[in-house]
């Protein structure tokens, strides 16, 4: 059902109206937070628990929540016609809970029209958004409607327009290519449906037509690869943009399949293919790798306080997860960057719940979740969370 302006106005009455005149100032100093990718709608207790870690913000996706249609908020990613009012009401209730807990929210959808999240699409890549600009128009319409509905909510600190876009996928660009290769690729595809900066310009214009103040966060391409901004010839035209990247490299070591290796890939010491050569990962390589987005920012007049590592992490049962987290966080804090760890008390996946005690097995996690006894999960000691909290101070 299409959300009319009258319906939006009625729902806005549910949200507090006090709103900062210039929200970008929140991001003038380093902000540290966590990701919320839960299937259940987080409540105030959840946000208070996150705030207790030292977090000041949460990167929140509502895309896993059950909605009125197939795709929460969008209704149907095959054809967007308006935000279902009941979905919007649920989201506003969640934002109210975050506000009550004193934590700021950046909203991020996992799906857009023509780009349904693969885990809700039979594990199949949906790349219609990057092949048909009709879906650009629908995505802009969606964000116009959402910004119109939420622009005055005091919990909001930003709109992250899409999580981990992949306009380069299947288009002859290696995910780990060097800057020159990426730039040559973009020169070929600039102005096409694979032009991510142009897509963002269109969507931001739609947002700004109704909301001139809420910051916009944009992920780089290739799943927000930290090197993806290297092909952007300029920063975006809007002056309230945060540029986001994610950090899971070397993925072969930080991800779940490594737990099945005997022996596990270690850190430092794991190797991977990067920019045409095999590298051995240690703190120096982490620092060099993460320097790339900041080098791009400096070259294009973007200050470090507009750069965000919006996701990073490693599976908690990896023997070297703590050492890896420490080196990533040392590097990010040296740049005075914003960051958000992945993830906080995710209810459908235990692998990056750093509060869980090392003794908690995957089987115990899923059993207690299924029995509705998640509150019985042992959350101390939590040496990995200690690493994260130490870097928040």
Predicted regions and their residues:
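Gram-negative bacterial Sec-dependent N-terminal signal peptides
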Residues: 2-19
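Active-site mouth of glycoside hydrolases
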Residues: 21-215, 220-230, 240, 348, ...
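A non-catalytic, amphipathic alpha-helix used as a structural packing/dimerization or gating element
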Residues: 53, 138-141, 288, 292, ...
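Short beta-strand segments enriched in hydrophobic/aromatic residues
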Residues: 62-64, 109, 247, 314, ...
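Short, hinge-like loop/turn segments at secondary-structure boundaries
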Residues: 76-77, 123-126, 176-177, 233-237, ...
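Glycoside hydrolase catalytic-domain groove-lining segments
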Residues: 193-198, 202-205, 213-217, 221-315, ...
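Aromatic-rich peripheral "rim/lid" segments of glycoside hydrolase catalytic domains that contact
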Residues: 319-393
